[in-house]
Every structure is written in structure tokens, then in C-alpha cells.
Amino acid sequence: MVLLRIAGMALALASLNYPALLLASQDEPLILDPDVSFDPGIDFGFDEDIFIGAFEEESEKSPTAEWFEDFTIRVSQSTSGQANNHAIDLGPFGSFPKEADLETNRLQFNIRYQNAFAPGWVLQGSMWYRIYWNQDYEFVSNGDAVETEGQLNDLFIQRSSGKHSFKLGRQTVVWGETVGNSVLDIINNSEFRDFTIIDIEDARLSQAMLVWDYFDSANSSSLSTFVNLYPEFNPAPIRGSPLFFDPGFNLPDYDRDGKVLIEAGTQWKKSFEGSDIALMAAYLYENQLRYDPPLSDTPDARPDINDFFLLGFSANRAIGKVLLNFDLAFSHNILADSFAFPGTSSLSAPINLRKDQLGTSFGFEYAIDNEQNVSLGIQAQTLLDEDEGLLPGQALTNDGVFGSWLVRYSNALRNGDLNFSATLQGDLSAQSLLVFTGLDYTIDDNWSVSSQIISMSAKAGSFLTFFDEDLRLGITLTYTF
């Protein structure tokens, strides 16, 4: 500061003693002699310390604050229930009354962690923890007491180097192109507890896997191989949930009894201009357990597993705003009469045959504009030689061509702060229909609110007969930080 004051005084004195020079500088430019030079060694007396810290932040982040930057935490309170008072016609069994009732009332914490802790290394994990409040079906099943539960969604470490990428830990592997309705999307098991989850994308469960991805030098083709080190199966429905049907006995988990179960598969994918194709093969276990009735001295059913081989092909093609999808699956040695309605378990049937199955799914995605999108997916499957091995009078639960269809529409409004979505889903035999509409509103960077309406209709004999004329409403308030 002293040096600056001295410099200011010198300039003031110069202006008083040499006014003519100042006026000349204003009237015409001063032209220096071309022989004039400056000595770079001259010390003008500037104090460099005055600039230290001028552009630095006032305070550095603590190690704890930097560590928390890798976390994303979402806290949500959700409530939903069946709102329509009605009765279900069960034919010769009479009618079953259904009253409006609150089904879910819960506080959920979602925690996600992702850290690129070194070049080529990534650690990622996510989990949720729930508190079930009064009138939630988990609360009722717990003897009218608050219940808590936590679950690890995924936790893996990834190493990428050159053309190779390795991932080890709990993760999901998704095959197929048809969105939400692919016959190839059967690697990971899933859990449909209630009607708060109706999309397979939200129902998938992670498993302990090693995944190796190899990319060619042009990035036009890749080879992906997985090994499932501990195959798991669809959990039995939670007692008391809307999707629980009491069979009169317990549905336990499969007892491995020292058995080593492993799944493995590989997929080759090739990209062309505007399209992709893929070939895949895998050795898998059916995700849905099959239960035989319990023995006379035990209340527990006897779960059984079945392994099979899968061969698949998938392709897509982009034409303007339209993306066409196609999947083909051939399954060898699957259980022919396995009952696998989402959220329920396979109950024993008098027919216990293993057959080959051919399935296909196809559809399209259409981008109406930058905010609107619509997609259609149709899945159809059939058993090959379905009558072979059947005794006179026997028939399969799934005979002929069976499958489902799915239509989705989404629209982002108000610069993406307001999102509307609609889903229609039914079976190919036109026995049931589910209609879902959702509205999500982002209040600010932290707060958001969402609402859902689910309407269902089903004919007699459908797996969804018990939910005919159900109308479910739900709302969720979320805080993210």
C-alpha cells in the first residue's frame, strides 16, 4: 500500500509541473523514437504480494464435504390406495366385496453413490430404506406396528482400460430392444410387490455378476459376457400385499443345500448406420420358482428350479423419427405349465413337462417432437409341440399363442418441469387391461411431487379377475439433495 501511495503522489506532482505535456498528450499522440528500448531488468517496485489470493475462493471445501459430493440422496413420502367400492363377480362362487382402502403409506430413503476414484476406475452403489407407517399393508402384517426394511440395489466396481471394461458386483444385465416388453429381458429376477411398481425397469433386482465388455477399435461392434455367480429367484409375494393370494401354506425360498448354481451368457452386437443387430446365447435358470404342495408333516411348499438354454437375436432400425425394434428368443427345456403372473409364484399343476418355446417381441418408438414420445411393444410366445406328452383330457395353461402388448406415451411440459405419462397394458387374448396415468412436477432443484392413477378391468378367467374395476390413486412428495 505504501508503494501505491508514493506512485499516486508522483503522478500528482507530474501533472502540476508539466501541464503542457498533459495537454499535448490529449491533442496528438506521442511518437517514440524507434531506437528507444526498455531494460527488462528495471525494478518498478511492484509488491506482488497484493495479488496473492485475489482469485482464490474464500474457503476450501473440507474432506467431508468433498466425500458427500459423490452421494445423491432422495427422501420421499408416498401414499396410495384402492378408491373404488365395488364387488367382484366370481360366478358360481358368488361375489367378493372390495371396499376403498389405503394400501401403502411409507417413507423411503434412496441413496446413490458414484465415485471415479482413479483413472479408469468407478465405484457405484445404490440402496433404499423404508419406514412403513400406519395403514400400510406392511404395517398391518407386522401386527399394527411400524416396520422398517432396507435393500441393496446395486454395488459394483468397474475397471475400463483401452478396449476392455470389467464390472464386478451386484448389477443388472438387460438384453433385447423392445422397451418394457422384450422376450429377451429375462436375465435378472424381478419383484412386483404392489401396484406402486408396474414397469419391468423398476422391478428388476440386481445379482452378483462379473461382466466383461470388449469394444473393437472402430466402436462399431462389441462383445459382452456375463457370469452370474449367485443366481437368485423371484421373491414370493409379501403376505398382506394387494398381490398376495394365500394358498394355504408357506412359500419359502429355494434351499440350495450346498449346490453351486451359475448362469452365463454372451452377446455380440454390431452397429451400422441407423441400425443395430445382436446375437446372444445363455445358460439360465427360470426366475420364477415352481412350488409343489407341502408334505403332510410340514406347512411349507417345496420350491423347485429349472435350468434352460436361451438363443436370441435382436435388431433395431431408425427411420426418421421412428425407431423399429425386433427381438427373437428360442428357449430349450423350459417348464411348459409354469404360472408366472407378476407378483405371484408358480403353483404346482398336474402337468410337469419341459418343452421348447419360441417367442418374439416387436414394436416401435416415435418421437413426435422434442417433448413427446410414444412407443408400442407386442410380445407373443408359443410352445413347440405343445400337445406332445399330454394325457387324454389334459391341457396346458398356456396353449396356442400367448403374450401381451404395451403402449406408452410421455410429454414433457414447461421446459421439462411438468411431465405427463400414460401406459396401457393388456394381454393378447383381450382378457385384461391396465391403464396408468402419471403426472410429475418439479417444484425446484430439490422438491418434486408426483401423482398416479391406475385403472384395471379383467374378464372372468383372467389372472387379473380379482382386480377387476379397481381404481388406485397415489401421490408422492420427494426431496432430493
Q: Where do the language-model regions lie?
A:
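N-terminal periplasmic/intermembrane-space "pro-region" immediately following the signal or transit peptide
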Residues: L21-L102, Q108-R112, D199
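Repeated loop/turn-to-beta-strand initiation elements of outer-membrane beta-barrel proteins
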Residues: F71, P119-L123, K163-F166, N219-L223, ...
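Residues on the lipid-exposed face of transmembrane beta-strands in outer-membrane beta-barrel proteins
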Residues: F109-N115, D154-R159, L210-Y214, T266-K270, ...
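Detector for outer-membrane/organellar transmembrane beta-barrel domains
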Residues: L284, N316-Q425
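Outer-membrane beta-barrel "beta-signal"
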Residues: I453-S455, D468-F481
